């Protein structure tokens, strides 16, 4: 057979000098052997349909395989290198042919897949540009940032001033506030011949509604009578609380009235001194001086026993206040 003849042939490769004729002979012999092998395989497939032919081929293939293995063991490394080089050349030529085919396809015209790829690429570029613009705008908005909440606010000088002007702040006005015209300064000053002598609106209202003090005193006396007649302890406690609240209000009102009288008396005295030419500038009383003057006037109006009780009570009150303000170590020591 041709395959056995080609395999049994002894080939000796020259190391120093490569002969192209031997290389061509080797490649042709290998091609012939491969063709023969393919023909033999096709014959074996065709003969596989018959049972007797298969048995004969199987019996004859066993010694042939052993002969092929023995002949392959005797092939030199130079022949194997030349065969490998020939296979590499054939693969490179096939790659070149494939590249030429692709180039010719491109020269023929653009395919629909290329159009789709181009559209996808364009949409991606547009999306990247839009995201970049949004990030830059966000960065610009975040530029005036304070280091802490106590730091002053930073604002660009290019900020345009609004043309609108807030005349009335709607947020400050929670709702329409009720106004009583009886206590309005305009109403109280209207119809009087000398508003300056009358004083402010509060003084005028106190003068016009002074009868309320009489009503308050009458109500306090009636509550004291009810407390004397009451027998229920809960009712007594409620009446005591009401009487205490009313007496505190009356005492506060009287104290404010005394302070106003002291201030008015001092202003009249200072005005008279300036009119007489004894003083050039008036002297205004401080709040502490006004309280001292009111306390002095109150002690003068009291009796001896009441004055002594009030002084003792005031001393205890001041001592308790000083004890509360004193540190714990000094308080216990």
UniProtKB/Swiss-Prot annotation:
Q: Which InterPro entries does the UniProt entry name for this protein? A: RRP36 (IPR009292)
Keyword annotations of the record = Coiled coil, Nucleus, Ribonucleoprotein, Ribosome biogenesis, rRNA processing
Q: Where is the composition biased (Acidic residues)?
A: 32-43
Q: Where is the composition biased (Low complexity)?
A: 84-95
- Chain segments annotated as coiled-coil in the UniProt record: 218-259
Q: What is its main location?
A: nucleus
Q: Where is the composition biased (Basic and acidic residues)?
A: 102-129, 319-333
Write out the annotated subcellular location.
Nucleus, Nucleolus
Give a short account of what the protein does.
Component of the 90S pre-ribosome involved in the maturation of rRNAs. Required for early cleavages of the pre-RNAs in the 40S ribosomal subunit maturation pathway.
Q: Which family does it belong to?
A: Belongs to the RRP36 family.
State the protein's name: rRNA biogenesis protein RRP36
């Amino acid at each position: 057979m041709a395959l056995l003849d080609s395999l049994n042939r002894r080939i000796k490769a020259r190391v120093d000098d490569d002969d192209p004729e031997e290389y061509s002979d080797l490649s042709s012999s290998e091609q012939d052997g491969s063709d023969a092998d393919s023909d033999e395989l096709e014959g074996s497939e065709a003969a596989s349909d018959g049972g007797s032919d298969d048995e004969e081929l199987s019996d004859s293939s066993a010694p042939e395989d052993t002969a092929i293995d023995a002949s392959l063991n005797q092939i030199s490394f130079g022949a194997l290198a030349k065969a490998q080089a020939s296979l590499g050349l054939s693969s490179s030529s096939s790659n070149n042919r494939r590249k030429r085919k692709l180039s010719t396809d491109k020269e023929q015209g653009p395919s629909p897949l290329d159009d789709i790829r181009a559209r996808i690429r364009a949409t991606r570029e547009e999306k990247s540009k839009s995201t970049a613009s949004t990030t830059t705008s966000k960065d610009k908005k975040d530029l005036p940032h304070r280091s802490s909440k106590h730091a002053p606010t930073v604002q660009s000088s290019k900020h345009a001033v609004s043309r609108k002007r807030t005349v009335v702040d709607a947020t400050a006005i929670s709702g329409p506030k009720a106004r009583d015209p009886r206590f309005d300064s305009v109403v109280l000053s209207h119809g009087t011949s000398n508003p300056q002598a009358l004083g402010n609106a509060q003084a005028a209202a106190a003068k016009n509604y002074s009868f309320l003090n009489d009503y308050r005193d009458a109500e306090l006396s009636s509550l004291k009578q009810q407390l004397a007649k009451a027998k229920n302890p809960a009712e007594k406690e409620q009446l005591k609380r009401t009487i205490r609240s009313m007496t505190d209000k009356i005492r506060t009102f009287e104290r404010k009235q005394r302070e106003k009288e002291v201030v008015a008396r001092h202003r009249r005295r200072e005005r008279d001194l300036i009119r007489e030419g004894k003083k050039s500038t008036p002297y205004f009383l401080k709040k502490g001086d006004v309280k001292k003057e009111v306390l002095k006037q109150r002690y003068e109006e009291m009796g001896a026993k009441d004055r002594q009780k009030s002084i003792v009570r005031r001393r205890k009150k001041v001592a308790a206040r000083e004890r509360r303000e004193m540190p714990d170590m000094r308080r216990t020591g």
